[in-house]
């Protein structure tokens, strides 16, 4: 507020020193002072309600990340399982009873398919266990610490105290109850006087 009056005062001083006061026509606006007051009053009390981050916030992040990674493992496991079961195996041995030919590439290929089945099952189990554990952790992470409960109670008391001091207007004013606000009790003419 003082910085605004200093700048306004310095502008008037410059206008006076430059050769006289210039007359202004119209309505003066004091909106800049109103908004300065509002923002100052809002930011004065901001520090009162700051709350430190609790360890529960980190556990919340932990279970969410675990749930997402568990979901990824389940999807990856299902994909690898599908590859292991849906890709047809190759024939390893062919021939007659007395003469059998074994294809070593087919044996390795079929071994890789079996490995895919096993890896898919393991990934699916790890992902499912991770998801179940993280869902349980989310349920148990809802319990608040004593400090956080105390801060919440203190915040609620302050809000209740503020509401108790500011009482809303519940009845309409009667015919004799009307009063002019102090700021409007004196009317000051800001229009220039007409010379004619």
From Swiss-Prot:
Induction: By retinoic acid in neuroblastoma Neuro2a cells. Down-regulated following fear conditioning (at protein level). Pfam families: Neurensin. Expressed predominantly in brain. Also weakly expressed in lung and spleen. In brain, expressed strongly in nerve fibers of the cerebral cortex, anterior cerebral nuclei, hypothalamus, amygdaloid complex, brain stem of the metaencephalon and medulla oblongata, and moderately expressed in soma of neurons of the dentate gyrus of the hippocampus and Purkinje cells of the cerebellum. The chain crosses the membrane at residues 67-87, 121-141. It is a multi-pass membrane protein. GO terms for cellular component: cytoplasmic vesicle; growth cone; membrane; neuron projection; neuronal cell body; transport vesicle. The keyword Transmembrane helix applies. It comes from the Eukaryota. The keyword RNA-binding does not apply. InterPro entries: Neurensin (IPR024883). Keywords: Cell projection, Membrane, Transmembrane, Transmembrane helix. It is found in: Membrane; Cell projection, Neuron projection. May play an important role in neural organelle transport, and in transduction of nerve signals or in nerve growth. May play a role in neurite extension. PANTHER family: NEURENSIN 1-RELATED, NEURENSIN-1. Belongs to the VMP family. This is Neurensin-1.
């Amino acid at each position: 507020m003082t910085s605004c009056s200093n700048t306004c005062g310095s502008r008037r001083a410059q206008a006076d020193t430059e050769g006289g006061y210039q007359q202004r026509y119209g309505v003066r606006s004091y909106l800049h002072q109103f908004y300065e007051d509002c923002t100052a009053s809002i930011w004065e009390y901001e520090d009162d309600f700051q709350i430190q981050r609790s360890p529960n916030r980190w556990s919340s992040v932990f279970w969410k990340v675990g749930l997402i990674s568990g979901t990824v493992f389940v999807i990856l496991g299902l994909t690898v399982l599908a590859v292991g079961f849906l890709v047809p195996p190759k024939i390893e041995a062919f021939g007659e009873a007395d003469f059998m030919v074994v294809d070593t590439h087919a044996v390795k290929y079929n071994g890789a398919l079996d490995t895919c089945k096993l890896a898919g099952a393991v990934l699916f189990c790890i992902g499912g266990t991770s998801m179940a554990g993280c869902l349980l952790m989310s349920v148990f992470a809802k319990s608040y610490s004593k400090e956080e409960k105390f801060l919440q109670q203190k915040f609620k008391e302050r809000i209740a105290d503020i509401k108790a001091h500011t009482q809303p207007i519940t009845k309409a004013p009667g015919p004799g109850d009307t009063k002019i606000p102090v700021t409007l009790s004196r009317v000051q003419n800001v229009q220039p006087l007409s010379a004619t």
